[in-house]
Protein backbone atom coordinates (compact mmCIF):
# COMPACT_ATOMS: atom_id res chain seq x y z
CA UNK A 1 0.00 0.00 0.00
CA UNK A 2 2.85 2.40 0.79
CA UNK A 3 4.28 2.00 -2.73
CA UNK A 4 0.95 3.12 -4.20
CA UNK A 5 1.28 6.39 -2.31
CA UNK A 6 5.00 6.86 -2.99
CA UNK A 7 4.94 6.53 -6.78
CA UNK A 8 2.46 9.36 -7.41
CA UNK A 9 4.57 11.58 -5.14
CA UNK A 10 7.76 10.67 -7.00
CA UNK A 11 6.09 11.39 -10.35
CA UNK A 12 4.70 14.69 -9.05
CA UNK A 13 8.12 15.74 -7.75
CA UNK A 14 9.76 14.84 -11.07
CA UNK A 15 7.20 16.87 -13.01
CA UNK A 16 7.68 19.85 -10.68
CA UNK A 17 11.45 19.59 -11.08
CA UNK A 18 11.15 19.65 -14.87
CA UNK A 19 8.92 22.74 -14.74
CA UNK A 20 11.27 24.50 -12.32
CA UNK A 21 14.28 23.80 -14.52
CA UNK A 22 12.47 25.13 -17.59
CA UNK A 23 11.34 28.21 -15.69
CA UNK A 24 14.86 28.90 -14.41
CA UNK A 25 16.32 28.49 -17.90
CA UNK A 26 13.71 30.90 -19.31
CA UNK A 27 14.92 33.61 -16.93
CA UNK A 28 18.24 33.82 -18.80
CA UNK A 29 19.92 36.14 -16.24
CA UNK A 30 23.30 37.66 -17.14
CA UNK A 31 25.83 40.37 -16.40
CA UNK A 32 26.56 43.00 -19.03
CA UNK A 33 30.26 42.97 -19.90
CA UNK A 34 30.24 45.78 -22.47
CA UNK A 35 27.95 48.44 -23.89
CA UNK A 36 28.87 49.03 -27.53
CA UNK A 37 26.32 51.77 -28.21
CA UNK A 38 22.78 52.71 -27.24
CA UNK A 39 21.25 49.58 -28.75
CA UNK A 40 23.89 46.84 -28.49
CA UNK A 41 25.47 45.14 -25.48
CA UNK A 42 27.64 42.11 -24.76
CA UNK A 43 26.76 39.72 -21.95
CA UNK A 44 28.80 37.32 -19.83
CA UNK A 45 28.17 34.27 -22.04
CA UNK A 46 29.80 36.08 -24.98
CA UNK A 47 26.63 36.91 -26.91
CA UNK A 48 26.15 40.31 -28.47
CA UNK A 49 22.60 41.48 -27.81
CA UNK A 50 20.79 43.93 -30.10
CA UNK A 51 17.87 45.58 -28.30
CA UNK A 52 14.68 44.88 -30.26
CA UNK A 53 12.91 48.00 -31.49
CA UNK A 54 15.71 50.41 -30.59
CA UNK A 55 17.63 52.55 -33.07
CA UNK A 56 20.32 54.51 -31.24
CA UNK A 57 22.91 56.83 -32.78
CA UNK A 58 26.13 55.08 -33.74
CA UNK A 59 29.45 55.54 -31.96
CA UNK A 60 32.77 55.61 -33.77
CA UNK A 61 33.89 52.05 -34.47
CA UNK A 62 35.54 50.00 -37.22
CA UNK A 63 32.02 49.38 -38.57
CA UNK A 64 30.42 52.82 -38.36
CA UNK A 65 31.09 56.54 -38.13
CA UNK A 66 30.03 58.44 -35.07
CA UNK A 67 26.62 60.09 -35.25
CA UNK A 68 25.47 63.03 -33.13
CA UNK A 69 24.58 61.90 -29.60
CA UNK A 70 26.13 58.46 -30.12
CA UNK A 71 28.38 58.70 -27.06
CA UNK A 72 25.63 60.18 -24.91
CA UNK A 73 23.27 57.38 -25.91
CA UNK A 74 25.87 54.74 -25.01
CA UNK A 75 26.62 56.46 -21.68
CA UNK A 76 22.92 56.56 -20.84
CA UNK A 77 22.56 52.82 -21.51
CA UNK A 78 25.67 52.19 -19.36
CA UNK A 79 24.01 54.11 -16.50
CA UNK A 80 20.75 52.18 -16.90
CA UNK A 81 22.62 48.86 -16.69
CA UNK A 82 25.42 49.72 -14.22
CA UNK A 83 25.82 47.05 -11.56
CA UNK A 84 22.58 45.32 -12.48
CA UNK A 85 21.93 41.80 -13.72
CA UNK A 86 19.79 41.66 -16.84
CA UNK A 87 17.19 39.23 -18.09
CA UNK A 88 17.39 38.43 -21.79
CA UNK A 89 14.17 37.54 -23.63
CA UNK A 90 14.94 36.53 -27.20
CA UNK A 91 12.48 37.77 -29.80
CA UNK A 92 10.58 35.91 -32.51
CA UNK A 93 13.54 36.37 -34.87
CA UNK A 94 16.50 35.20 -32.78
CA UNK A 95 19.41 36.69 -34.78
CA UNK A 96 20.00 39.72 -36.99
CA UNK A 97 22.09 39.68 -40.16
CA UNK A 98 25.26 40.37 -38.12
CA UNK A 99 24.71 37.37 -35.84
CA UNK A 100 23.62 39.42 -32.84
CA UNK A 101 20.87 38.02 -30.62
CA UNK A 102 17.70 40.11 -30.96
CA UNK A 103 16.18 40.45 -27.51
CA UNK A 104 14.24 42.41 -24.96
CA UNK A 105 16.49 43.31 -22.03
CA UNK A 106 15.07 43.72 -18.53
CA UNK A 107 16.85 45.08 -15.46
CA UNK A 108 14.91 44.97 -12.18
CA UNK A 109 11.66 44.43 -14.16
CA UNK A 110 12.30 47.57 -16.26
CA UNK A 111 12.21 47.01 -20.02
CA UNK A 112 15.47 48.70 -20.99
CA UNK A 113 14.54 48.74 -24.70
CA UNK A 114 11.62 51.05 -23.96
CA UNK A 115 13.39 53.03 -21.26
CA UNK A 116 16.22 54.31 -23.49
CA UNK A 117 13.65 55.46 -26.06
CA UNK A 118 11.44 57.03 -23.40
CA UNK A 119 14.47 58.86 -21.96
CA UNK A 120 15.15 60.36 -25.39
CA UNK A 121 18.45 58.66 -26.21
CA UNK A 122 17.20 56.42 -29.04
CA UNK A 123 14.48 56.22 -31.64
CA UNK A 124 11.85 53.53 -31.97
CA UNK A 125 12.77 51.26 -34.88
CA UNK A 126 9.48 50.97 -36.75
CA UNK A 127 10.87 49.38 -39.92
CA UNK A 128 9.50 45.96 -38.96
CA UNK A 129 6.76 44.50 -36.79
CA UNK A 130 7.43 43.39 -33.21
CA UNK A 131 5.48 43.08 -29.97
CA UNK A 132 6.11 46.58 -28.52
CA UNK A 133 6.30 48.59 -31.73
CA UNK A 134 3.36 50.92 -30.98
CA UNK A 135 4.45 51.40 -27.37
CA UNK A 136 8.01 52.29 -28.38
CA UNK A 137 6.73 54.72 -31.04
CA UNK A 138 4.60 56.40 -28.35
CA UNK A 139 7.65 56.63 -26.06
CA UNK A 140 9.62 58.34 -28.82
CA UNK A 141 6.78 60.78 -29.50
CA UNK A 142 6.61 61.58 -25.77
CA UNK A 143 10.39 62.16 -25.54
CA UNK A 144 10.30 64.45 -28.58
CA UNK A 145 7.39 66.42 -27.12
CA UNK A 146 9.20 66.80 -23.79
CA UNK A 147 12.46 67.71 -25.60
CA UNK A 148 14.54 65.33 -23.53
CA UNK A 149 17.72 63.44 -24.35
CA UNK A 150 18.84 63.90 -27.93
CA UNK A 151 15.59 65.75 -28.71
CA UNK A 152 16.56 68.64 -26.40
CA UNK A 153 17.69 70.84 -29.29
CA UNK A 154 15.42 69.59 -32.07
CA UNK A 155 12.97 72.00 -33.70
What residue ranges belong to the model's regions?
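Small beta-barrel nucleic-acid-binding modules, primarily SNase/OB-fold domains
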Residues: 1-155
